[in-house]
């Protein structure tokens, strides 16, 4: 079994100031997006759209605002609405944690709509350009989660080579043993708990880095290396992220204040299903439009 390194959440101490790893990952995500965006400017069809370095900088400014505002509001509405409605001032305590990818996605989408309107560009042309820049940021965010030892996975067989002990999960592990006696006996988890006072879990943050970050990045980079019908790159992102998140959620521990919802699915899975369906619909629409209106549909217009 592996043991979580239990990193110090503070990455850098600057006198009275403390820079946390998770905050540092936002900076890493921002820089990575700039690098990927500038590399994409070298593609002939992207250059033909008239994108500039200033466009990337301005777009990321909108994107950061959309991510923070949407991510926070999404967490408030999707995950802990009753608590925040009772304590509305706590909504502004972002330093205490609580961000939602799906909320951040909606926030970024609205931000890109505004950016497209101001630049008089097609909204889908903007999202097609942005989509390959996103996975590196997702990977950085999940790395921040792993360093913090949070958002760990579900309990698993200790014989699994990837099973990991998370100290932060220890307070919940005794209750898990009581609630799942048969599985505990099958996996000999009582013995493990007696020795470590913790239970082995999936390092689901690392799974998300691999699928939502690395794999999705290469899929989008490969798919977008040549011109595609407008909306197709955005569609592949929606489908790819939705499938990756839906899959990883089977190994990720559900939020304790929500648990599993209808059909035994988590909130993350229910929020990912619409992304997959919309992505499939958008992909079909974009290729049909390209076939019937080739002069208007290709992403280089």
From Swiss-Prot:
Membrane protein topology class: Multi-pass membrane protein
Stored InterPro entries: Lgt
E.C. number: 2.5.1.145
Question: Which family is this sequence assigned to?
Answer: Belongs to the Lgt family.
* Protein name, per record: Phosphatidylglycerol--prolipoprotein diacylglyceryl transferase
- Report the protein's function: Catalyzes the transfer of the diacylglyceryl group from phosphatidylglycerol to the sulfhydryl group of the N-terminal cysteine of a prolipoprotein, the first step in the formation of mature lipoproteins.
Q: Where found, per UniProt? A: Cell inner membrane
Domain of life of the source: Bacteria
Where is a 1,2-diacyl-sn-glycero-3-phospho-(1'-sn-glycerol) annotated to bind?
Answer: 142
Provide one Gene Ontology biological process annotation: lipoprotein biosynthetic process
A single cellular component GO annotation: plasma membrane
Q: In which pathway does it act?
A: Protein modification; lipoprotein biosynthesis (diacylglyceryl transfer)
